[in-house]
Each structure stands twice: as C-alpha cells, then as structure tokens.
Amino acid sequence: MSEQTIYGANTPGGSGPRTKIRTHHLQRWKADGHKWAMLTAYDYSTARIFDEAGIPVLLVGDSAANVVYGYDTTVPISIDELIPLVRGVVRGAPHALVVADLPFGSYEAGPTAALAAATRFLKDGGAHAVKLEGGERVAEQIACLTAAGIPVMAHIGFTPQSVNTLGGFRVQGRGDAAEQTIADAIAVAEAGAFAVVMEMVPAELATQITGKLTIPTVGIGAGPNCDGQVLVWQDMAGFSGAKTARFVKRYADVGGELRRAAMQYAQEVAGGVFPADEHSF
C-alpha cells in the first residue's frame, strides 16, 4: 500500500488516511504540479486547528518576534525564546511538517554555529526541519546541516533579518539584481535545501526560478506560480493590525471577533448577566 498523506492519496485537497507529512511529499507534489499551503504557528492551540484544517507545513517563524513578543523586527528574538513555541506546535500538529526558523545571529558565523543552533531545534524543540535566510552566503551552512541529516528550507529575496542592510521592506530581484536572486536560488538548491522561500520577488522572476529548480519554491509576495505559498497566520486570519503587506489576503476577522467576544464578556460580568444559573453548580 502506498504511503498516504494528510491530504489523502498524496495530493493536496484530497481525502483519505492522515499520516505524517515528509519533505519527499513536497518534492512529489512539485513533480505532479500540486500546489500547497504553509502557515506560521506559534502555539499548541492554533497548530492543532491548522493541522486539522489540513495545512501540510507549519513554520515556527522568527516572525514570532513581532506577533508574539512585540519586537519591531525579527532581529532581537533568540533561540531560547523560539524553542518553547516549537514544542507547542509539534505537540499540536501530529501530521504537519514543522519547520523552525534559525534566528539572526545563530548561523551567520559559519557551519559550526549553524549546526549547533539547528541541533537544538531538533533535539530540544522537536522540529522536523529548520529554515535560514540567505542565498550563496549560507550555502556552506546548508550543506553542513543536510550532511548531518537536518532538512533545510532556504529563504531568499527579501530576508527580514537583513532589514537594516536592505534599507527597509523592499522588493528584491528587480532589474540587474535578478541574476543574483537566481544565483542564490541555484546555490541553496545545490547545497541540499529541500525547498526555498522566495519573499517579495517579482512574479515573473519567481516563475522563472520555480521552473529552473527541481526543489519546491514557496512564495510570499512572489506571485501565483510558486509551488507553495506561505503567510503569517495573524495576517491571513485578520488578527494583526489594520495595515498589512500588499501580498496578504485576509480570510477572516479573527481579531474583530475576539475583541467583540471580550467586550461582551466584560459587559455581562459587569452587569451581573454572567455567570447565570446554568453556569453554576
């Protein structure tokens, strides 16, 4: 019997037995032309919901710096702040592939530092893979991790950890810079990455790279032709502030509903409406 996935019959959107998603499923989906979704997750409860919804890949992103800890950028967050979040997500999502971000400062020094950081996420956090930002400049780190048996998702284009160097949140790979983005994509693939995130890259360039690579591409602000797509769940579900990036589509108003529920709860407590007899022993 062939191995089944969360989607059933190994195809996104299908039905059937639910088993663990592995990196080879993503490779197969690329070969078969099946697109798939990835979301961030930072705790047990939301990870459980996303797993039940059939999201095959969950990213414990360093975006937790913004949406969990309230930092202005992703730069300050540490391994020690991320690992407890990874543990919760892994427990809540028995079927999804859980990828953990290596935070700024944990891998730039070279392969030895990258291996130490990634090992912590797998051993202490239970992550199934790690993600790190950069193209050619981190190819050696990627090769080291994959040689050690650690699956790596790469991240090129706009890399949030380099926001200060890049001069803010800007589209990458326009004009002459396109060749460097292509070189970065090829470098991470040749180093052994099982997939590559492309952030804020022109759609035409992302399409070209997706066609060149044998590994899956994951877009975030990179057009519709990547093999997968990823969003921060708070942006996707309307839980973050009113202003979001152009590439975000809101599928709900979770923030508004939570605010309404909290206000109603407070009003009913103040007015003596809650708890009522049916809520008492």
Curated annotation (Swiss-Prot):
Catalytic residues (UniProt) = E199
Q: How is it modified after translation?
A: Pupylated at an undetermined lysine residue by the prokaryotic ubiquitin-like protein Pup with the help of the ligase PafA, which leads to its degradation by the proteasome. The cross-link involves the side-chain carboxylate of the C-terminal glutamate of Pup and the side-chain amino group of a lysine in PanB.
Residues recorded as binding Mg(2+), renumbered to this chain, are: D62, D101, E133
Q: Where in the cell is it found?
A: Cytoplasm
Q: Which UniProt keywords apply?
A: Acetylation, Cytoplasm, Magnesium, Metal-binding, Pantothenate biosynthesis, Transferase, Ubl conjugation
Pathway assigned to this chain's UniProt record: Cofactor biosynthesis; (R)-pantothenate biosynthesis; (R)-pantoate from 3-methyl-2-oxobutanoate: step 1/2
pH dependence per the UniProt record = Optimum pH is 7.0-7.5.
Q: Quote the catalytic activity from the record.
A: 3-methyl-2-oxobutanoate + (6R)-5,10-methylene-5,6,7,8-tetrahydrofolate + H2O = 2-dehydropantoate + (6S)-5,6,7,8-tetrahydrofolate
Looking up InterPro entries in the UniProt record yields: Pantoate_hydroxy_MeTrfase, Pyrv/PenolPyrv_kinase-like_dom, Pyrv_kinase-like_dom_sf
Q: Where is this region: Disordered?
A: 1-20
Reproduce the miscellaneous comment text: Was identified as a natural substrate of the M.tuberculosis proteasome. Was identified as a high-confidence drug target.
Q: Matching HAMAP family, A to Z?
A: PanB (MF_00156)
* Family from the record: Belongs to the PanB family.
Q: What does this protein do?
A: Catalyzes the reversible reaction in which hydroxymethyl group from 5,10-methylenetetrahydrofolate is transferred onto alpha-ketoisovalerate to form ketopantoate.
Name of the protein in its database record: 3-methyl-2-oxobutanoate hydroxymethyltransferase
Source species: Mycobacterium tuberculosis (strain ATCC 25618 / H37Rv)
